[in-house]
Amino acid sequence: MARGNLSSAQMGLDLAPVAASVRFLCGVDEAGRGPLAGPVYAAAVVFDPAKPMLRGLADSKVLTASKREALYDKICERALGWHIAFATVEEIDTLNILHASMLAMQRAVQGLAEKGVTPDLVQVDGNRCPQVPFPVEAIVKGDSLVKAISAASILAKVARDRELLTLHEVYPQYGFDAHSGYPTPQHLAALAQFGATPHHRRSFAPVREAIARGLVAF
């Protein structure tokens, strides 16, 4: 496992003694960095060390939608604590998608702490860490290596997909139910035909180009 770029401000503590005494490990992951529309979601999960680990956990991207939905409910039941958060399209356009993703993860951990679950260590998928008031490290490919991160990836993915299904009910012509906002040929064609909705990310090139051509939907 590889640690990301950790500053003293992000850490506050040396991880070596912390890792040796971890009881409550918090896994964190995001969903939705690549889409052209919709918020970016993040989840934080702490499993109860007194309970058997849930089987079937894996990176959400390799699971079917039905499997993710089934695991979502089991994770929520089995976890000691969990929290889902997001950063809005406006925040994505203002901060950029990387910083908005960090903000969503920070909110997920904060929400978990506000529920009374205090992690000894936070492990985040990827190579960068959000600023949180706990020891934190980044784990490259953590969503396939660390069960708590796998669980977080599933919660974030399912929550975001549900949000895009809601958008589909309002804007069925874009096919959000099929691509969840990702830049598929179907989505790009709809963007070119119908224009950008208020839920599209203006800072992303295909959306920016559509707006420049006067293609805006309300």
Curated annotation (Swiss-Prot):
Major localization class: cytoplasm
Residue sites binding a divalent metal cation per the record: 29-30, 125
SUPFAM superfamilies: Ribonuclease H-like
Cofactor binding notes: Manganese or magnesium. Binds 1 divalent metal ion per monomer in the absence of substrate. May bind a second metal ion after substrate binding.
Record-linked InterPro entries: RNase_HII, RNase_HII/HIII, RNase_HII/HIII_dom, RNaseH-like_sf, RNaseH_sf
Location(s) in or outside the cell: Cytoplasm
Gene Ontology CC terms, in alphabetical order: cytoplasm; ribonuclease H2 complex
Keywords for this protein: Cytoplasm, Endonuclease, Hydrolase, Manganese, Metal-binding, Nuclease
GO biological process: DNA replication, removal of RNA primer; mismatch repair
CDD domains the record matches: RNase_HII_bacteria_HII_like (cd07182)
GO MF, one example: RNA binding
Entry EC number(s): 3.1.26.4
Reported function: Endonuclease that specifically degrades the RNA of RNA-DNA hybrids.
Protein name listed in UniProt: Ribonuclease HII
Origin species: Cupriavidus pinatubonensis (strain JMP 134 / LMG 1197) (Cupriavidus necator (strain JMP 134))
